[in-house]
Amino acid sequence: MILCSIVALALVIERLVSLRGAKVAPDKLLDEVISITRTSLPSSDVVNKLAASSALGQVLAAGVRSVVAEPRLSERALRAVFENAGRVSVHRLERYLNTLGTIATAAPLLGLFGTVVGMIEIFGSQAPTGGSNPAQLAHGISVALYNTAFGLMIAIPALMFYRYFRGRVDGFTVDMEQAAERLVPHLMRFAVKSSA
């Protein structure tokens, strides 16, 4: 259980640092991209800087790159590019969340397991002749129940942070989808219409 608590604490700290709003979806990033692409498509250096800036930047850069690479890109294809880039970004944002959820689920079970083993030991150590001390038995049971309490002490915060981080990722996902939706018509102005 000590290992579970150390891993859970490390994951919580890592996710708190990684899921900051400024690092994932900066507030003015979409407006900056629209401003930069108002008259023409940016150079590859600018697009690379955009992609390196944040998860939202990676998604927006994927759309800009696709229009630069294929000027006859259809709106449907551009939306597919944004969708694929969004999936990759969301997958990165969800990193370690399943591990944190597993710890939240497993910690109380490990505590319960420790309690059961402790109870077996306590009752197994009692004299079969009936000369057992009730106070000693009660003390042994209370010590065994500490395992369950420790499991819950790990599980409750881990579950709360898991839910918090899940909500953050869901919020960032919506933000990225909305930004991509706003950028699609803007980028389609640069797409060359194919003559059929």
Predicted feature locations:
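Predominantly long cytosolic amphipathic alpha-helical stalk/bundle segments
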Residues: 24-113, 117-131, 164-196
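Short hydrophobic alpha-helical membrane-anchoring segments
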Residues: 11-18, 121, 160-163
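Pore-lining and gate-forming transmembrane alpha-helices of multi-pass membrane transport proteins
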Residues: 135-162, 166
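Residue-level signature of catalytic and energy-coupling elements of molecular machines
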Residues: 8-9, 45, 60, 111, ...
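Hydrophobic alpha-helical transmembrane segments
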Residues: 1-19, 153
